[in-house]
Amino acid sequence: MPFLSSMDYRKGPHTKYLIEYHFVWVTKYRYHVLKGDVALRLRELVRQSCEMMEIHILRGVVSKDHVHMLVSAPPQWSPSEIMRRLKGRSARKLFEEFPRLKKRYWGRHLWARGYFCVTSGSLTQEMVAQYLEHHFERRSDDQFDVEP
């Protein structure tokens, strides 16, 4: 999905809005566990969760120890609730599907506490997109990449 312009407001039953967040969250201890099948599955889980919440992923990157996402969210979802759901569901599912992660994270916490969030009003979409575009060499036409 291309970036929304200021004229491309989203609509709800009683609202018209354009709310965009740039999120970053990291693995506990910054371990490089988001590789291969784990990274691909994480991307799919995040996409599913966002779809359930009607959140549009404008751009994203799964790196080895962190995730960046620029999203457009409906007004009923606060940044803290978005992160609670994305981090919680993804950790639960990844631990179920990849038992080797349980050995690395014996305390059952895949993600470090906290996250970074900024509205795209503070950082322009172009600044975030440029950072994500140059974060690594892009290999696909997909808007949500997995770092090699």
Language model feature labels by segment:
Residues M1-P148:
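Basic nucleic-acid-binding interfaces
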